[in-house]
Amino acid sequence: MFFKSKDNNKENELSKVAALLIYAAKIDQDFSEKEEIIIKRTILAIGAKKEDVDKIIYEGKEIENNSNQILEFTKKVKNMSENDKIKILESLWRIIYSNKEVDVYEANLMRRLAGLLYIDSKIMGDIKERVKKENS
């Protein structure tokens, strides 16, 4: 029973991360298949079991659809390891650059996230540039 509860907590945490990634993917009104693939890879990279990914994404979509503020998603991410935060931020930038453009809403989202997650602006800039080079 203990292990089941621990697994459920991890899934819930990952569902909130998925919700944040989905929020970013939808902010430009164009949630593409490419963005969903990036989200799945990220969820796997931060500890999901392969067989749980679709369920976690589904729950993330439900959370994102029923939430009205970004703060709910960032609470879980803020307490994650620095390494996992960087993976998530890289994925957020990959989602944003997946259509080769950064619109005003996406740029604003990333500025807000840097502050909410206590990410140094230099680190955020480095992540952005690294992902931008990947996509050029």
Feature map (PLM): residue ranges:
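Small-residue-enriched hydrophobic alpha-helices in membranes
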Residues: M1-I27, S32-S136
